[in-house]
Amino acid sequence: MVRKYFGTDGIRGRANGVITPELALKVGQAAGLVFQRGDHRHRVVIGKDTRLSGYMIETALVAGFTSVGMDVLLLGPVPTPAVAMLTRSMRADLGVMISASHNPFEDNGIKLFGPDGFKLNDAIEHEIEGLIDADMHKRLSGSNDLGRAKRIESVHARYIEFAKRTLPRQVTLDGLRVVVDCANGAAYRVAPETLWELGAEVIAIGTEPDGFNINRDVGSTAPAALIDMVRERRADIGIALDGDADRVLIVDEKGQVVDGDQLMAVVARSWKEDERLTQPGVVATIMSNLGLERFLGGLGLSLARTAVGDRYVLEHMRAHGYNLGGEQSGHIIMSDYTTTGDGLVAALQLLSVVQRQNRPVSEVCHCFDPLPQILKNVRYRSGEPLREDSVVSAIEHARERLGNAGRLVIRPSGTEPVIRVMAEGDDRGLVNAVVDEVVDAVTRAAA
């Protein structure tokens, strides 16, 4: 299915380039029409992160939704998982998050959630795409049937309480010194407050958004500042969220980064011991390290792999009854609690394990030695470099060289014009060589 607007995580691109007020208006109208089912008054909740362009896109979306008769509840800056949760809690027909996640401030995006709090499937996105470019003039509501917009003031308190309730009442964070990096993004208020209310000594960074500094040298894609602060303040743990707080990485007390694969390993082992896993396994993507698969195998658990994107992980979880899944990048999905990746909730579940075991984070969180894994990105302007004969030949040769000693994954990004080339295996030299071979071929084809 060819997509014009939607990628693997909603619609995303440069603000006032791809993501224009005109497009946001049309998305609001199209999505509003698709989700006006039944004869009740329809409503949509809209949240955003802290990008400057969020104001522009929010206003255009409001115009679009209200013009087709939908009421709008404005949440302001909140994490993506808060939008998913509040869509269900407030009985909305649709939820919208304005964010480009871990991308720089120049980008923005529009993510859509259904009334059940789950991201939309491909079929519904295709239906919306079909209406975006349609003539809306005859579909607009009459003057007496326009929607209203209202700002909701209690959003942060609701989400904080929701996050806290994912822990047993007897679990506190007393005695823990926690550094939390909010990436100058959507969780800049709720994450420190939640940790403090649970009893932690909280040191917060990345909590001064100005519209331009989201993800800039902070957050889960730039953990250096968090590592330095953990070491400087002798903290027990560091928590790095991204711009919309749907992903998380951990830094242990020694300043070592713990990625999503290790987090899934920790939780899977704990939940297996507590008989909380609904299936004997975990769902991850093709990018997760082979070391995770081997570790889980040693526990008698399987690793099911999907295409890259937390939506595909979640779709597989729902279809096959899993309650734990995620991505190496830090999207951790715990479907007992959430309908999407939730960085704060994932961090709280890890902290619960740390408190129960009463051991340093470095001893709890490094469950396996990851195999050498090399990932390189090749940017291209247009065309389909992966279809070039020279690239196909290079990929086939690289796979032959790896044989059964590793994996090679080549894929286009779903959010930017980039080809990602990843290989892993027991022999680092061989892994480097096959990645370089493919990268060189793609680079020449993309020139």
From Swiss-Prot:
InterPro entries (UniProt xref): A-D-PHexomutase_a/b/a-I, A-D-PHexomutase_a/b/a-I/II/III, A-D-PHexomutase_a/b/a-II, A-D-PHexomutase_a/b/a-III, A-D-PHexomutase_C, A-D-PHexomutase_C_sf, A-D-PHexomutase_CS, Alpha-D-phosphohexomutase_SF
Cofactor note: Binds 1 Mg(2+) ion per subunit.
Disulfide bonds: none
EC number: 5.4.2.10
Pfam families: PGM_PMM_I, PGM_PMM_II, PGM_PMM_III, PGM_PMM_IV
Cofactor(s) listed: Mg(2+)
Active-site residues annotated for this sequence: S101 (phosphoserine intermediate)
Post-translational modification: Activated by phosphorylation.
Binding-site list for Mg(2+): S101, D242, D244, D246
Modified residues (Phosphoserine): S101
Catalytic activity reported: alpha-D-glucosamine 1-phosphate = D-glucosamine 6-phosphate
Molecular functions per Gene Ontology: magnesium ion binding; phosphoglucosamine mutase activity; phosphomannomutase activity
Keyword Magnesium annotated: yes
Protein keywords: Isomerase, Magnesium, Metal-binding, Phosphoprotein
Cellular component terms per the entry's GO annotation: cytosol
Source taxon at top rank: Bacteria
Family annotation (PROSITE patterns): PGM_PMM
One GO term (biological process): peptidoglycan biosynthetic process
Function statement: Catalyzes the conversion of glucosamine-6-phosphate to glucosamine-1-phosphate.
Family note: Belongs to the phosphohexose mutase family.
Name of this chain's protein: Phosphoglucosamine mutase
Source organism per UniProt: Methylobacterium radiotolerans (strain ATCC 27329 / DSM 1819 / JCM 2831 / NBRC 15690 / NCIMB 10815 / 0-1)
